[in-house]
Swiss-Prot record:
Annotated GO biological process: abscisic acid-activated signaling pathway; defense response; flavonoid biosynthetic process
Signal peptide annotation: none
Pfam families attached to this UniProt entry: Bet_v_1
Other facts: Fruits silencing FRAA3 exhibit loss of pigmentation in mature fruits due to the lack of anthocyanin biosynthesis.
Role description: Involved in the control of flavonoid biosynthesis in fruits, probably by binding directly to natural flavonoids. Binds the natural flavonoid catechin with affinities in the low micromolar range.
Biological classification of the source: Eukaryota, Viridiplantae, Streptophyta, Embryophyta, Tracheophyta
Name of the protein in its database record: Major strawberry allergen Fra a 1-3
Family recorded in the similarity comment: Belongs to the BetVI family.
Protein keywords: Allergen, Flavonoid biosynthesis, Pathogenesis-related protein, Plant defense
Subunit (UniProt): Monomer. Interacts with AP.
Source superkingdom: Eukaryota
Gene3D superfamilies, A to Z: 3.30.530.20
């Protein structure tokens, strides 16, 4: 098994507490509402929404994949850190065991820096193609922008 690690950063004008509430704590409700092309729905398969919870995310028509299962590995509401793993779904195929993510929101000039670390755990000595990672980063950046625009248009939400 190989492990490949990738890091990325995005910036947002939304401060970490508000962005964390929207993007992490209420994502299962918010994202299908504002970005149905990305996520159709989310359901808890096992757990109570905390660490260890497994969710099935039904992806939207804009995705080339149909679903993924997320396992929540950690939620730190005080430091705005969220970690989870994609453990199943057509997005990981038969060459990847899981993809683990850590997302950290850091305050910066009234907004946030979103720091994301991805660990691809492969089956055997498979190499992850750069275009696969780049496409994932672009989807994530696009989703952050949709959430940011929603929060700017609805400043009363997630205070």
């Amino acid at each position: 098994m190989g492990v490949f690690t990738y890091e990325s950063e995005f910036t947002s004008v939304i401060p970490p507490p508000k962005l964390f509430k929207a993007f992490v704590l209420d994502a299962d409700n918010l994202i299908p509402k504002i970005a149905p092309q990305a996520v159709k729905s989310a359901e808890i398969i096992e757990g109570d929404g905390g660490v260890g919870t497994i969710k099935k995310i039904h992806l939207g028509e804009g995705s080339e994949y149909s679903y993924v299962k997320h396992k929540i590995d950690g939620i730190d509401k005080d430091n705005f850190v969220y970690s989870y793993s994609i453990i199943e779904g057509d997005a990981i195929g038969d060459k990847i065991e899981k993809i683990s993510y850590e997302i950290k929101l850091v305050a910066s000039g009234g907004g946030s820096i979103i720091k994301s670390t991805s660990h691809y755990h492969t089956k055997g000595e498979v190499e992850i193609k750069e275009e696969h990672v780049k496409a994932g980063k672009e989807r994530a950046a696009g989703l952050f922008k949709i959430i940011e625009n929603h929060l700017l248009a609805h400043p009363e939400e997630y205070n």
